[in-house]
Amino acid sequence: MALRSISFNQDYTCLAAGFDAAYKVYNCDPFGECFQKADDGGANLVEMLFSTSLIAVVGIGDKPANTMRKLKIINTKRKAVICELTFPTAILYVKMNRKRLVVVLVDQIFVYDVSCMKLLHSIEASAGLDDRIICDLCADDESVLVFQQSGSSDELAANAGTVVVFDALQIQPINVIECHRSPLQRIAVSKDGRLLATASVKGTIVRVFRVADGRKVHEFRRGSYTAQISCLSFNVDATVLCCSSNTGTVHFFRLDDVDRRRSTGSIDANIDGSETLPRESSITEEESSEINRLINSQLGGHNGFAKKKSAESLKNFIWSKSKTYLPSQINSILEPKRDYAFIKLTTEVESVVGLVDNNCYVATRAGDFFVYSVQPGQCVLLKHYKIE
């Protein structure tokens, strides 16, 4: 059976998988299948409600009864459908916690009360460049909902990297945060709804914002080359952020107090410290020669490409040297932090990631389930299973 979707539940204790002809739920530790249903077709989306017996399922659209416009709420103990909701267009995402159910279409977001499946609110939205809406819902009852800003085509282009923060419990907006210049690729909100993680379609920089005031508290460099981010996820207490991409690499970034003290909010305090900017400091003879050589190459008879390369070299050289004249506190702000640990899968494949204590679960679209021990540097593979 072909694997169509994979997703962890809210505390990473279970994994839900949708196949062409069935859908299943697996325990993560120890890994093993604990539920399957194959008598009503496959599933394009499967969303769990923690480890309860309720799951939300969207079909693959191979027949009218299994349309992608219908959401089924299923009791896994009785293997029975307890509620069905039908929508005007295909369902793109389903997010759920103990208070709210969020259903995302190409142009609308619907918010329901989980206790009675009553529609509470609908939000007009506009899909991004690839006809999808990026969103997430926090796992706690606070029900913080985050999604990309909508608008006309021109407005979308101008605000492609902007996130709307919405209180789905009280049904009111909280904030609008400008996160990236480029269109969004992936966003995630922490379990308690206090932190927002974002990545753009470039996939090189990952940012973390405080939801309440929109303040950027962390900025990380995932890599130098463009990648498609497939998953951003916080651990349960929001001290570590995980990031996976189609390159087959998983990165782990620290969000602890040591890093917070280096965030942009501490610039003023750090500048008042003992380390100050030098007022008089001449460059070395070697640096002077290198700058002169680069400038002369700019003025020479090179073609356009060579000039562009020289200009880039000049910019990079001056930037790297200028940082040596800045206090380390400033450099820690200007230079995005790197991961403290990473996983390199054997194949370049999209994956979803869940971090529990010092163990990381990685489920791939190729049907593999890995368990790694997370430690500084390259993580150690502990176990490998097949999702089938």
From Swiss-Prot:
GO terms for biological process: autophagy; protein transport. This is Autophagy-related protein 21. Involved in peroxisome sequestration to the vacuole during macropexophagy. Also required for microautophagy. InterPro entries: PROPPIN, WD40/YVTN_repeat-like_dom_sf, WD40_repeat_dom_sf, WD40_rpt. Contains a beta-propeller domain involved in specific binding to phosphatidylinositol 3,5-bisphosphate (PIP2). The L/FRRG motif is essential for the cytoplasm to vacuole transport (Cvt) pathway and for the recruitment of ATG8 and ATG16 to the PAS in nutrient-rich medium and in both its recruitment to and dissociation from the PAS under starvation conditions. The lineage of its organism: Eukaryota, Fungi, Dikarya, Ascomycota, Saccharomycotina. It is a peripheral membrane protein. WD repeats lie at residues 179-219, 224-263. Its main location: cytoplasm. One of its GO terms (cellular component) is vacuolar membrane. PANTHER family: WD-REPEAT PROTEIN INTERACTING WITH PHOSPHOINOSIDES WIPI -RELATED (PTHR11227). A motif (L/FRRG motif) lies at residues 220-224. It comes from the Eukaryota. Keywords: Autophagy, Cytoplasm, Membrane, Protein transport, Repeat, Transport, Vacuole, WD repeat. Belongs to the WD repeat PROPPIN family. Disulfide bonds: none annotated. It is found in: Cytoplasm; Membrane; Vacuole membrane.
